[in-house]
């Protein structure tokens, strides 16, 4: 299954600034243009995968600024239980282990009318990818207590790195350099929680208008840890 949609509204800032005649007065007053083209497809075989590609553009004809995403990519895979057979009950810590995968990729440009689709525009582009794999499981302990464990692994790929230097007293700014080249870094976190459900009933007597009130309490405790990568 795939879908495609497009809405394109692109123009020259010079044309819109020079549109003083009555026929184009609406164009002159409307100083923002935007476009979007998207394609999505679902691959149904197990595990199913969703893919979407989007190209977008936003333009201000007064300031001549243009922001583009060319393209934005999203990939997501359905949740998998690697230790449980499909269609069978998932009981216990091992059979309940599950994970999925997602990918986000963006290619962004911040440019102007003058540099539109020029080498300068492409040289200033920013490209990055983020891979995410959340893993979790849940199970019963002591018969009435539910426990869950989860962790998430994230890895970022980038093709430009900004290196900051000491404060420059002459310019009054922190000097920075943009270094071209592939780099990557990973982050992860871990969490766990314990919880149970307690039921109780207050009886007031059968001769009362309100004979009983049933209450439910769900106490829980959780802990999360994210290591520092400074």
Where do the protein language model's features map onto the residues?
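Outer-membrane beta-barrel proteins and related beta-barrel translocases across Gram-negative bacteria
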Residues: 1-230
